[in-house]
Each structure stands twice: as C-alpha cells, then as structure tokens.
C-alpha cells in the first residue's frame, strides 16, 4: 500500500469515468532522488546476503539506538560503499575487521571509505552503529516512519511503516529495491510492559536487568528492506494451522489484548483467503517463516510474514466498498489486499519504484479474484469493473526510473482492470490461472522488471500484448472504440491509442450471441446479425471507452462500456 493513493483507496475521487485528469507538472528530481533510487557505483559492487539488525526502542524520549551488521558478497573491486540512513538519525561508527572506517555524508547516504581489500567473490562483514530520533510518520502507512501511538487504554503502541519513505528511515541498509538479503535477524529491545512482534519466527526472548526485553526474530528467506517492521504493544497471541499446497503453514495472530474475541471472528477470513490465493497464484511464499497478522494503529501494510492490520475489524475498506457493488462488504479489504502482496510485492518484487504496478495492480486484481472465489465469477468481474470509477488517468502508471519515483495511483484500479482485460483476451480461465501461477513459480523470491513480467505473460498466453501494456501502463489514454451501426453493417476503429494498437474485443449482438471483432486504427466494416440495434454492446469486461458516432451530437459523449 502506498501513500500516493490515499484518496483513491478511500473512494473519494468522485465522478471520474473516462475523462482524463488535468496533466500534472513533470516531476523535478534531485541528487538525493538519484542516490536513493539508482544502483550507484558505490552500491553496484556488493550484494547484501545477511542483515543482523539490533535496535533498542526508547518510548520515553522517542529515540532508538543500535546497529546493523551487514554481511555482503563482493562482485567487483571497490574502495567506497554506500550505506543509507535518513536524517535526523546519526551514525556513531562503522567498523570492519576491528577498524573504524571514515565516512562522508551526502544527505541520507553515507559513503564509507574501505581499508581492507575487497576480493571478488569474498564475503565480508561491516557493522553500522547509530542512534537518534527517527522520522515520525505523519500519515502512516502512506507517509511513513516511526509511529509512537497509544491504545485505547493509553498504553504505548509503537510500530513502523515505511514502504515509500524507505527502511533507512529507521535502520541503516542498502536502501534499494533490487537487492534483498538472503535472510535477516531482527532483534528489538523494548520496555518489559510491551510485547514486540517482527518478521519471521521468534527465536528467543531475553529479559534484561534494566527493565527491558529483547525479542529476537529470524527470517530465513529473502526480504524487502521496507518489509522489516517493529510492532510493540499490549498484544495477545493465538495460533492456527493452514493445510496448504506445501504442507502445514503456521498462522499466528497478534491482536491487542482487549480485541482477541473480535479478532478470532474477523481473522477467520484468513484461511479462505489463503486457499483462494494458493489456487490462483501458487503456494504461499513463506512457509518457513509462517503467516502472521498483527494489529497496528495504522491501516495496514504488507510486511513480509508479519502483515500489519488496522482495519478496525470491519469488512470492506474501513467499512466501505471501494467498488460500489456491495461485493466488497463481504470481506476484509486489509486481510485480502495486504496478504496478496505476499505473492506480488514480497516474493515477486520490483527492482525499481517506477515498476510499483507489479505490486499494486496484481494485489488489487487479487481482490476481484477473492470475490470470485467466494461469490462467483460474475461477482468478481463486477467488483473489478466497479473500481473503474476511481481511475484518474492523471499520469502514466509506470514512473521515472532511477529516482525512486512511482507512477500514478491508477496502478491499483487501472492496473487491475488491465489484467482483467488481458484475461478476456486469453479467453481460457485454466490457461490464465496457469499464467498467474507460473509468474509465482518463475519469479519466486526474485526482484524483477516490468519487461520481464510483460514478456512472461505475452509468451505464456501466445499473444503479443506489447501495445496493450504500452497503452495502459505508459500513457494516460483509454482505448476508445468508435463505431457506426447502419442496419447490419458495423464500421469500427480504435482511437486514443498508441500506434499499432490492435486489441481484439468481444461484442454482443443479441443477449445470447457473443463474437469478436479485431479493430485497428483504420476503419473496418463487418456484417453482423442484429435483431435490434439496442442489442449491440461491447463486453464490459474490457476496460475501453465506446463511442457511437451516429448518435446525435448532444448524446455523443464517450460512454464507458468496458
């Protein structure tokens, strides 16, 4: 879930159908954006293999202190390394092989001068010690950082949420999406009065003599930096087991102590969700680390194996249905959407923020698939189609590369409708399911590019989808099917499309008669069997606009048919 889509997710963008929003001014990027978003030379030569993170959280003064011991593999010789840690946090020292290293700071990036030779293929270790007051999240999870909250009994409730802001907002690391450690330890020390829950499995709990407790969690799989999370509060715990495609998956639930009975009822949706998503996407990606659902004071976040939940135990999105169909009120949005990210976002991860659609389009599409699993195929389609009213077509879905810049919030609903449209083109649900499961298998625990995902879907479908991806991901256009129906003669063409766009589309010429037409940018004419002109429709499962050119001018507005 991303900060840029706050209004869209709430469904507060009224009356937007096919109209395009006013063009936004082009973004202006800085050196800081490049240092954050690109694989700089000081990053490119080393591969993070293990993070050993130890952090003490001090709620009395909202400070943290600790260190991250970074194990990395050398891929080329270098003398300088980039480590990211955001202001106002302070690096105390950086140590390798017992020697303190000199650094220079450039905003949120530290450039470490190395003393020891960096031999290609060797594994090395470096420890970064730091402290300070981390950025406080203004509007978590969208504008992220540390959250110093209290529960309804005014007890401390401390969590992190930092996908867009970056993990370096509270701990030092190589803060780029394309490099994940193979595993990670997360050891968090907090006052004894609270319980702390992080990613992976709990390995030890140490009660210290100074009134604090250290919780040591361990993740045995690759993990995104931004997925690493602190959750400290007055939690209670209960567990269950899901019999899944890879055997027994442990389910651990961490609601606040006074919400446990409510949680047991609401969290019963987890097993049907897992069953649905395993059937469509393949096995849950983290059997070794388990599945956790943790109550948080913010709305929610896809923290790997530790999904943050703050939907107030309501169905829908804070009790509302984003699709406007009613179907979304029959399940909990946060459980479904954020858990879908375990497949698309956590197991399959973008290399660059510009390709965020890989996370959000698929997770939003998963909402429709869950609706299909529980309410039927028609309801699933209606849910996805209902989300079109939230599409703005303001800027392209794909952002700018190398500067930590995601594109339009349309990556959610427009991206989901693009995938729903492609499903129609595949026109074979078994094959479509195979494509989705194949994505999960082929790119299991990998970072990827848009081109890889586009290429895989095109290859496995046997269709050249390049122009379709270009249209929906790289422009703000919606394909418009212009047509003229004169008796049994249908003339048609595509407009408002990228050059070479020739997507087939399904039409109905009677309530029971479906057929395909193959428009291009040039006019085509076909004879159709039509009993009544009003029986002609373009299948609404296609996200396109439709324009009848023979209607009177006053009625000739663009009408959303797909």
PLM features: residue spans?
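N-terminal, polar/Ser/Thr-rich
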Residues: 6, 19-65, 149-156, 466-467
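Acidic/His/Gly-enriched intrinsically disordered linker/tail segments
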Residues: 220, 356, 360-421, 425, ...
């Amino acid at each position: 879930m991303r900060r840029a889509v706050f209004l869209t997710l709430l469904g507060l963008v009224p009356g937007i159908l096919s109209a395009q929003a006013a063009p936004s001014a082009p973004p202006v990027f800085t050196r800081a954006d490049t240092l954050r978003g690109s694989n700089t030379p000081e990053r490119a030569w080393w591969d993070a293999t293990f993070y050993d993170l130890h952090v003490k959280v001090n709620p009395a003064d909202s400070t943290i202190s600790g260190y991250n011991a970074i194990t990395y593999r050398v891929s080329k010789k270098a003398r300088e390394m980039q480590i990211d840690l955001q202001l106002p946090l302070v690096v105390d020292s950086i140590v390798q092989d017992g020697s303190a290293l000199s650094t220079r700071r450039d905003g949120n990036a530290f450039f470490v001068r190395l003393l020891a030779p960096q031999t290609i293929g060797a594994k090395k270790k470096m420890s970064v010690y730091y402290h300070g007051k981390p950025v406080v999240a203004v509007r978590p999870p969208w504008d992220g950082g540390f959250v110093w909250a209290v529960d309804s009994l005014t007890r401390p409730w401390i969590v992190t949420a930092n996908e867009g802001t970056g993990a370096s907002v509270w701990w030092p690391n190589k803060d780029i999406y394309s490099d994940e450690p193979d595993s990670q330890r997360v050891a968090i020390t907090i006052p004894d009065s609270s319980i702390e829950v992080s990613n992976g499995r709990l390995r030890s709990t140490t009660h210290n003599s100074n009134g604090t407790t250290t919780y040591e969690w361990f993740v045995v799989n690759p993990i995104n930096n931004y997925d690493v999370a602190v959750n400290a509060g007055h939690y209670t715990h209960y567990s269950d087991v899901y019999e899944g495609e890879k055997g027994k998956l442990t389910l651990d639930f961490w609601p606040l102590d006074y919400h446990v009975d409510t949680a047991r009822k609401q969290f019963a949706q987890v097993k049907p969700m897992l069953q649905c998503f395993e059937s469509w996407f393949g096995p849950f990606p983290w059997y070794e680390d388990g599945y956790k659902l943790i109550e948080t004071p913010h709305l929610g976040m896809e923290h790997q194996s530790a999904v943050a939940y703050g939907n107030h135990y309501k169905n829908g999105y804070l009790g509302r249905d984003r699709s406007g169909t009613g179907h979304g009120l029959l399940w909990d949005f946060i459980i479904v959407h954020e858990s879908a990210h375990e497949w698309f976002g956590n197991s399959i991860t973008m290399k660059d923020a510009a390709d965020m659609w890989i996370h959000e389009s698929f997770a939003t599409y998963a909402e429709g698939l869950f609706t299909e699993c529980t309410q039927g195929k028609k309801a699933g389609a209606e849910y996805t189609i209902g989300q079109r009213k939230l599409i703005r077509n303001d800027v392209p879905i794909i952002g700018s590369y190398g500067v930590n810049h995601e594109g339009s919030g349309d990556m959610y609903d427009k991206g989901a409708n693009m995938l729903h449209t492609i499903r129609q083109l595949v026109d074979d649900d078994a094959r479509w399911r195979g494509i989705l499961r194949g994505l999960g298998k082929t790119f299991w625990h990998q970072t990827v590019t848009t081109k890889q995902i586009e290429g895989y879907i095109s290859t496995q479908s046997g269709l050249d989808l390049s122009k379709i991806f270009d249209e929906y991901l790289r422009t703000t256009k919606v394909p418009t099917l212009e047509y003229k129906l004169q008796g049994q003669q249908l003339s048609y063409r595509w407009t408002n499309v990228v050059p070479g766009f020739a997507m087939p589309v399904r039409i109905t010429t009677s309530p029971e008669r479906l057929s395909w037409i193959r428009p291009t940018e040039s006019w085509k004419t076909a004879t159709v069997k039509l009993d009544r002109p009003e029986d002609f429709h373009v299948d609404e499962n296609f996200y396109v606009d439709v324009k009848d050119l023979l209607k009177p001018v006053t009625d000739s507005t663009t009408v959303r048919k797909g």
